[in-house]
Amino acid sequence: SRMPVLLYGPPGTGKTALSETVGDAVARQEQIGVTLYPLSLATRGSGRVGEMTKLLSAAFDATLSAAEKLKRSSGKAAGGIIFLVDEADAVTQSRENAQMHHEDRAGVNAFIRGVDRLAEKQLPVAVVLCTNRLTAIDPAVLRRAAEIFDFDRPGDKQRRAVIEAPLTELGFNSAHIDEIVRLTAGGKDGVGFTFSDLTQRLLPTLILDAYPDKPVRFERAIEILRVLKPTPRFREGKPS
């Protein structure tokens, strides 16, 4: 069985946000409860021998136990679980790296065993991995992936879809929004604004700049945009 779904791409492109919210859509469609189990990076432990393996095994044990209770003899589960591993390269980095610490290597083995246990039992669990560094993921984890999705920076239509409603509410017209879409496309290097650049930086900056009693003006928005830079391109390192 092929278990994990892997989402990769630059920071700020929505990988984690989608993973944390997709369960709501599934729950509504299937009329079941869906629970998110985020795997904390604390499972890497402090480096003591056997600690990472023990923590990862405990995380999978807890997930397996909860998922077993959701199985029904009718075949349709009473609920589902999303087992989310954000920054997955920190937990599943390639064992082909000659400089990899023994404890990290053992942790990858424990992770693979945990994924295989869930898959073999055909439990209602979706394992979702998010990473900025696809080449850093262990080949055995990649082979097990049911799907690998590439997340990139939003295009013109996508950026407009993100900013149109809030900017319209602030009094911007269509021509104003077109100009902001153009200015967030990036320069000659083609590095445009990410989703989080728009939602967590640009829009809040416009509001805070006008606080407490000034209107948000198009001319001022352009001034801010000329200073506000998009998240730099993520340069993915190759494993040793």
Residue ranges and their predicted role:
Residues 1-178:
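Walker A/P-loop NTP-binding motif of AAA+ ATPase domains
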Residues 156-240:
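C-terminal alpha-helical "lid" subdomain
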